[in-house]
Amino acid sequence: MIPREHVVGVDLEVRPDEVLDVLIEKGHSRIPVSRGSLDRIAGVIYARDLLATVRHGGLFTVSDLIRPAMFTSGSKRIAELLSEFQRNNTQIAIVQGAEGRTIGLVTIEDVLEEIVGEIHEDVPLRPAG
């Protein structure tokens, strides 16, 4: 889980170009969108949705692009969380504490790493033998 203080998100009121800047700068493909506070998540924005919309032109706002957020509790077991990701066809969830406050964010990659170990990205493939 990514703790709250390390969660990268944007406010619903920012301009789309600002969202793109954050996605590029931080290297994320999905980030939460909030209404003034991480405790008020409006949804999640996917880089591919933003890029496709920018490429096709036209006027749009961040709210036009957000997808519903998946919320989960910090006490959920790994197997349950994986099932939730599959059922909701998503790869990111907002983790809430007992009082409904956002305590962090978890991705399907986090879950898979708990099961199979660290996943290293951009590792060149080596021939066997």
State where each predicted segment sits.
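Cytosolic regulatory modules rich in charged/polar residues
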Residues: 1-129
